[in-house]
């Protein structure tokens, strides 16, 4: 990672995870009610579908780590999420979500409690969805693969060989490659490996793929969690497409960002993470 790049890793406990999932489920319920009333435009409908897929997958994963008695369905979480919204929006502004109340709620004897308002609890930088993993997080002993001036076949093989040496857990992959002798991009990838009983390893999650120019400026990013979304910045589509055209043998015409993502994920057997709906957008 370039010297001028820093990264902050945010640790969130299971209580906060439950609160976040429940709140997002409440947001989904609001989206669905708008949809029933035909009040959503096409981008809004797309966000509804993406949020629903993400929540269903995240809840399924989260429930595996919870005792059976604490596991909740999406519908149960929607109900809790709506209650959270009512608490946050319509009750005393100092009211907080259970387990995360402001100090004045935990200690009613606090003399400042009557004057408590949201201004006393400013947003915490870096804890919004758009801010998380803006730069892939630091990983101990990250793998760096240099693919400069390599042909497609050799590049594919080198990626597979290097990645297969990774241990179970998180990793970071840095790919450096010249594009048409004009632009040198650095691509950072975060992911998590799982080791199977038979000894095989697979990439269970691709958390984020970022592309930077020579000055370290973020020019494009692919975000892939439980579903895949494609976000472009400036001419990120064109640059990222150019980068991965080299990996698509026999592909003479420019490829779209969605197809690029499929090409990257296919190296790890993750084609299914791009839905047909997203492939059309």
From Swiss-Prot:
Keywords: Host cytoplasm, Host nucleus, Host-virus interaction, Inhibition of host innate immune response by virus, Inhibition of host interferon signaling pathway by virus, Inhibition of host ISG15 by virus, Inhibition of host PKR by virus, Interferon antiviral system evasion, RNA-binding, Viral immunoevasion
InterPro entries the record matches: NS1, uS15_NS1_RNA-bd_sf
RNA-binding found in the keyword field: yes
Pfam families per record: Flu_B_NS1
Family of the protein in this entry: Belongs to the influenza B viruses NS1 family.
Function noted in UniProt: Binds and inhibits the conjugation of the ubiquitin-like G1P2/ISG15 protein to its target proteins. Since G1P2/ISG15 is an early antiviral protein, NS1 may inhibit the host antiviral response. Prevents EIF2AK2/PKR activation, either by binding double strand RNA or by interacting directly with EIF2AK2/PKR. Also binds poly(A) and U6 snRNA.
Protein name: Non-structural protein 1
Underlying gene: NS
């Amino acid at each position: 990672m370039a010297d001028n790049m820093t990264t902050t890793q945010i640790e969130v406990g299971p209580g906060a995870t439950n609160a976040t999932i429940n709140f997002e489920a409440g947001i989904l319920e609001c989206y669905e009610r708008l949809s029933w009333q035909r009040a959503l435009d096409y981008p809004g409908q797309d966000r509804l579908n993406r949020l629903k897929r993400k929540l269903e997958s995240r809840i399924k994963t989260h429930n595996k780590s919870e005792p059976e008695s604490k596991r909740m369905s999406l519908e149960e979480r929607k109900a809790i999420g709506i209650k959270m919204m009512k608490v946050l929006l319509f009750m005393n502004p100092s009211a907080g979500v259970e387990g995360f109340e402001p100090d004045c709620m935990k200690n009613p004897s606090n003399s400042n409690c009557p004057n408590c308002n949201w201004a006393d609890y400013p947003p915490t930088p870096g804890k919004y969805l758009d801010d998380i993993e803006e730069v892939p997080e630091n990983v101990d002993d990250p793998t760096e693969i240099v693919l400069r001036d390599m042909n497609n076949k050799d590049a594919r093989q080198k990626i597979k060989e290097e990645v297969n040496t990774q241990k179970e857990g998180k990793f970071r992959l840095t790919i450096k490659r010249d594009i048409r002798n004009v632009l040198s991009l650095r691509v950072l990838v975060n992911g998590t490996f799982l080791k199977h009983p038979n000894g095989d390893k697979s990439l269970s999650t691709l958390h984020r793929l970022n592309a930077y120019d020579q000055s370290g400026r973020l020019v494009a990013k692919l975000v892939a969690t439980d579903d895949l979304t494609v976000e472009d910045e400036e001419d990120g589509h064109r640059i990222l497409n150019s980068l991965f055209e080299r990996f698509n043998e026999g592909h003479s015409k420019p490829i779209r960002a969605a197809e690029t993502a499929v090409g990257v994920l296919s190296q790890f057997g993750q084609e299914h993470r791009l839905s047909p709906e997203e492939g059309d957008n």
